[in-house]
């Protein structure tokens, strides 16, 4: 009991009254404080206030559901000491630990000890979270007027805006160029011949008024572009195959 020196108030729970006074005097000498007595069979009827004792000693007793009550009776960091206990030490230590005690250990073959945590049952403590960075809130105050934005129109060149010529899209599967091979069987030779005839017909078409590109509202009745949408001056326009051909 050398570890109990300086404990002011203790509770001794006894079973056998033989030599009881002697054991109480020994406990007083070890602690240097006052010692209260309680019979193990009267413990459930007792009405001790919470945090009343610095030390509780139990001798030759087997408690079942009283360890939680003893935990409330002890002050924070109070000690529990079992002497000449009844039952397996491992089972008792597990039961004491599940009741809320800490540092549960077997001091000797006939003695067990445990402690109450250094805080009162049901108490709360304020958690210390990391402080908010005041500079982080200033990020939202940054003005976006100083940022340079990219003009979308500058991303494209004039060549990128031009539509691809459909005449140059299809190539021969054999030569890899827009030129039919000798024994063309994919239809590219016929397509190139049709484009050639259409180009000749377009070149032969002459505009006497100079308004063909403006649309049908400005075209004459014999205009080869009649029925076609307006186009830009100088833009290549492909005429239908039946234009400039006699209907008879």
Curated annotation (Swiss-Prot):
Subcellular location field: Cytoplasm; Mitochondrion intermembrane space
InterPro entries: Anamorsin, Anamorsin_N_metazoan, CIAPIN1, SAM-dependent_MTases_sf
Region (Fe-S binding site B): 209-223
Residue window of motif Cx2C motif 1: 209-212
Keyword Nucleotide-binding set for record: no
Cofactor(s) listed: [2Fe-2S] cluster; [4Fe-4S] cluster
GO biological process: iron-sulfur cluster assembly
GO cellular component, one term: mitochondrial intermembrane space
Pfam families: Anamorsin_N, CIAPIN1
Record-listed [4Fe-4S] cluster binding positions: 209, 212, 220, 223
Residue interval(s) of motif Cx2C motif 2: 220-223
Family that this chain belongs to: Belongs to the anamorsin family.
Domain notes from UniProt: The C-terminal domain binds 2 Fe-S clusters but is otherwise mostly in an intrinsically disordered conformation. The N-terminal domain has structural similarity with S-adenosyl-L-methionine-dependent methyltransferases, but does not bind S-adenosyl-L-methionine. It is required for correct assembly of the 2 Fe-S clusters.
Protein purpose: Component of the cytosolic iron-sulfur (Fe-S) protein assembly (CIA) machinery. Required for the maturation of extramitochondrial Fe-S proteins. Part of an electron transfer chain functioning in an early step of cytosolic Fe-S biogenesis, facilitating the de novo assembly of a [4Fe-4S] cluster on the cytosolic Fe-S scaffold complex. Electrons are transferred from NADPH via a FAD- and FMN-containing diflavin oxidoreductase.
PANTHER family per UniProt: ANAMORSIN (PTHR13273:SF14)
Protein's recorded name: Anamorsin homolog
The species this protein was found in: Drosophila sechellia
GN (gene name): CIAPIN1
């Amino acid at each position: 009991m050398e570890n109990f020196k300086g404990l002011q108030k203790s509770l001794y729970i006894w079973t056998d009254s033989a030599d009881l006074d002697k054991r109480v005097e020994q406990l007083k000498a070890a602690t240097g404080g006052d010692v209260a007595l309680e019979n193990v069979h009267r413990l459930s009827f007792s009405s001790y206030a919470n945090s009343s004792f610095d030390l509780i000693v139990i001798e030759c007793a087997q408690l079942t559901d009283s360890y939680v009550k003893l935990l409330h009776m002890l002050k924070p960091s109070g000690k529990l000491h079992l002497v000449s206990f009844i039952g397996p030490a491992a089972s008792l230590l597990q039961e004491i630990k599940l009741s809320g005690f800490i540092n549960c250990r077997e001091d000797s073959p006939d003695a067990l000890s445990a402690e109450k945590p250094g805080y009162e049952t049901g108490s709360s403590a304020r958690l210390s979270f990391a402080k908010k960075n005041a500079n982080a809130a200033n990020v939202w105050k940054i003005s976006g007027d100083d940022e340079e934005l990219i003009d979308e129109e500058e991303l494209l060149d004039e060549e990128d805006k031009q539509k691809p010529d459909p005449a140059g899209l299809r190539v021969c599967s054999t030569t890899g160029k827009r030129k039919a091979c000798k024994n063309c069987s994919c239809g590219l030779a016929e397509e190139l011949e049709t484009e050639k005839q259409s180009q000749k017909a377009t070149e032969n078409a002459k505009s006497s008024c100079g308004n063909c590109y403006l649309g049908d509202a400005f075209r004459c009745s014999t205009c080869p572009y009649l029925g076609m949408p307006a186009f830009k001056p100088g833009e290549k326009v492909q005429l239908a195959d039946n234009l400039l051909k006699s209907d008879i």
